[in-house]
Swiss-Prot record:
The modification Phosphothreonine is found at residues 171, 261. Residues 217-229, 251-267, 321-331, 673-692 have a biased composition (Polar residues). Residues 170-179 have a biased composition (Acidic residues). The lineage of its organism: Eukaryota, Fungi, Dikarya, Ascomycota, Saccharomycotina. Inhibited by the regulatory subunits VHS3 and SIS2. It comes from Saccharomyces cerevisiae (strain ATCC 204508 / S288c) (Baker's yeast). Residues 32-41, 49-69, 91-122, 190-204, 280-289 have a biased composition (Low complexity). This is Serine/threonine-protein phosphatase PP-Z1.
Length: 692
């Protein structure tokens, strides 16, 4: 990172690539401007780039019209400056004719400025121009969610499934035994060079990190002999060989092609016996084995937990077995978590409900509380909201998610955000740069929690914006919005430490209702992970019944876990041990079949915050800069205009000290604005009294 020439080489490599799948004309304008950035010494490290190809002229190139042509885009990406790159995908139909593509590069001298008049309009215009962006009240924009009768019917159909659905939340007591805590060291390292370099990030550094997490108690569901919806647990091996073993993954049994998914995928095991244990000894140890190749594959930044020492792995498994032996002796008389959640929802609307649910939350006041907590730049022991307020937020968000389809169809303009991972300060920076809702429409691609230090504030603020602007603010599901992943990577521990286990269960129940994918303007397919070999129709996503957990294999699993690859194989098992990798052929087939121009996904750390793949037919967006405080990556947000002009707004990586300074400045602005508002209100009150 920090090597601008390497970056140019990477971007130029796409310019003269041959085309298997001709795409529409693409034009791009680039705006560069300088922004202060706090970069660590890591920025001097060089990065790997895509295979080099002949350099492209910066002037317009008109290729031979007799041959299919690709967008010829050159990006001069200098690491010391933040800039916006724009790519134009015409709103015309997906054409595969041999048309000419012209490169339009128009440098602009505009500098970084906070949007002024348009963002600063408000219901009450008094001193609106003096308010910081986080305090401005605006009229919501027109809804961008396209609705139709079929999606409404599906939503109604989904809500009726709650009586037969077993939520994937643990049934731990709030005072879990600390004896079940297991500490072990996980090694973060690079993978072998077997993966193609074009999809690995160059800002790779080997690091060691002590990760302490609590292993789950074996809870049990209450048995119901009249229902047959429990799934038999999948027995898995703890050996490394299990990651190489695969089973057929099929959305339907009539498919012509069978693909395989490794057994150690992150699905949830449920038993048909009366104990109904959520995590069995096998499934728990399998989860631990799976964590060795979890969220971000070693082909990019290997920040996932490669346990290289076999004896260390054996010790972990032995400890897991001891924990499970203890847990097997615990009898849990709790009722089904779904019934518990339904009881909460019923009590919230009942006249005889407890006092704590009688007073509905003020969503505007709640948002301001969360913003104040963020700008305070202090991680407090407790959340700024009460537990009953958190429950109400989850209940309201859950209802909205279920009222909207699993496959969102959105109209531009919209800003698309990748992984956030509990980096609350960076989320506030993102909103400051791109506009606080509702000044901009947003689509988040998932992974809101885990790894970061303020996952609760992050997900609560996003839920609050969803509640306030349900037709302009959208959240997709990521692979971290799942019970067993959050149990290992931090969100469970944070909920238990700062709230209680019931709060965590309620979040999991809400995660189970999140939509899975979105289509922008009928041309951009947005998803957290990627494609699936069993996806034959968009209706298969539309008709997914929610709430649902993340299964071991199949469509939902693939949408949340799959990754692109340069492999010659169209589909192959993923090195994560979960789902698949898909190559350029699979991407081109997908685009041709459904008439899309671009796949926009997240799920991977990329050094520049965004990274194109397969001649710009797929883009990875990652929005957590300085990820985990260990990697010097940038964060990015992809903005899609009404004319399908795609631009990228970048967040430079800040260390904790620099981030605190940014939050301090925001806190001072908010404090000053509050004082001015109070003075104005006092003045108005005095004037009214004097007139009377």
């Amino acid at each position: 990172m920090g090597n601008s020439s390497s970056k140019s080489s990477k971007k130029d490599s796409h310019s003269n690539s041959s085309s298997r799948n001709p795409r529409p004309q693409v034009s791009r304008t680039e705006t560069s401007h300088s922004v202060k950035s706090a970069k660590s010494n890591k920025s001097s490290r060089s990065r790997r780039s895509l295979p080099s190809s002949s350099t492209t002229n910066t002037n317009s190139n008109v290729p031979d019209p007799s041959t299919p042509s690709k967008p010829n885009l050159e990006v001069n990406h200098q690491r010391h400056s933040s800039h916006t790159n724009r790519y134009h995908f015409p709103s015309s139909s997906h054409s595969h004719s041999n048309s000419q593509n012209e490169l339009l590069t128009t440098p602009s001298s505009s500098s970084t400025k906070r949007p002024s008049t348009s963002r600063r309009s408000s219901y009450n215009t008094k001193a609106a121009a003096d308010l910081p962006p986080s305090m401005i009240q605006m009229e919501p924009k027109s809804p961008i969610l396209k609705t139709n009768n079929s999606s409404t019917h599906v939503s109604k159909h989904k809500s009726s499934y709650s009586s037969t659905y077993y939520e994937n939340a643990l049934t731990d007591d709030d005072n879990d035994d600390k004896d079940n805590d297991i500490s072990h060291t996980k090694r973060f390292s690079r993978s072998s060079n077997s993966r193609p370099s074009s999809i690995r990030s160059g800002s790779v550094s080997r690091r060691k990190s002590d990760v302490t997490h609590e292993e789950p108690n074996n809870g049990s569901y209450s048995s119901n002999n009249q229902e047959n919806y429990l799934v038999q647990a999948l027995t898995r091996s703890n050996s490394h060989a299990s990651s190489l073993h695969s089973r057929k993954s099929s959305f339907g049994s009539d498919g012509n092609t069978a693909y395989s998914t490794p057994l150690n995928s992150p699905g949830l095991s449920k038993l048909t016996d009366h104990s109904g244990e959520y995590f069995t000894s096998n499934s728990t140890s399998s989860l631990n084995h799976h964590s060795s190749r979890d969220i971000y594959p070693s082909k990019h930044i290997s920040n996932d937990d490669d346990i290289e020492n076999s004896s260390q792995l054996s010790n972990i498994h032995a400890s897991m077995e001891n924990v499970n032996d203890k847990n097997n002796n615990i009898t849990d008389s709790k009722k089904d978590p779904n019934e518990e959640f339904n009881d909460i929802m019923q009590s919230s609307g009942n006249k005889n409900a407890p006092k704590k649910f009688k007073k509905p939350i003020d969503i505007d006041e709640t948002i301001q509380k969360l913003l104040d907590a963020g700008y305070a730049a202090k991680r407090t022991k407790n959340v700024c909201l009460k537990n009953n307020e958190i429950l109400q937020i989850c209940i309201k968000a859950r209802e909205i998610f279920l009222s909207q389809p699993s496959l969102l169809e959105l109209s531009p303009p919209v800003k698309i955000v990748g992984d956030v991972h509990g980096q609350y300060g960076d989320l506030l920076r993102l909103f400051t740069k791109c506009g606080f809702p509702p000044s901009s429409n947003y689509l988040f691609l998932g992974d809101y929690v885990d790894r970061g230090k303020q996952s609760l504030e992050t997900i609560l603020l996003l839920f609050c914006y969803k509640i306030k602007y349900p037709e302009n603010f959208f959240l997709l599901r990521g692979n971290h919005e799942c019970a067993n992943v959050t149990r290992v990577y931090g969100f469970y521990d944070e909920c238990k430490r700062r709230c209680n286990i019931k709060i965590w269960k309620t979040f999991i129940d809400t995660f189970n209702t999140l939509p899975l994918a979105a289509i922008v303007a009928g041309k951009i397919f947005c998803v957290h992970g990627g494609l699936s070999p069993v996806l034959n129709s968009m209706d298969e996503i539309r008709h997914v019944v929610r709430p649902t957990d993340v299964p071991d294999f199949g469509l939902i699993n693939d949408l949340l876990w799959s990754d692109p690859t340069d492999s010659p194989n169209e589909w192959e098992d993923n090195e994560r041990g979960v789902s698949y990798c898909y190559n350029k052929v699979a991407i081109n087939k997908f685009l041709n079949k459904f008439g899309f121009d671009l796949v926009c996904r997240a799920h991977m750390v990329v050094e520049d915050g965004y990274e194109f793949f397969n001649d710009r037919s797929l883009v990875t967006v990652f929005s957590a800069p300085n990820y985990c405080g260990e990697f010097d990556n940038w964060g990015a947000v992809m903005s899609v205009s009404e004319g399908l002009l795609c631009s990228f707004e970048l967040l430079d990586p800040l260390d904790s000290a620099a981030l605190k300074q940014v939050m301090k400045k925001g806190r001072q602005e908010r404090k000053l604005a509050n004082q001015q508002q109070q003075m104005m209100e006092t003045s108005i009150t005095n004037d009214n009294e004097s007139q009377q």
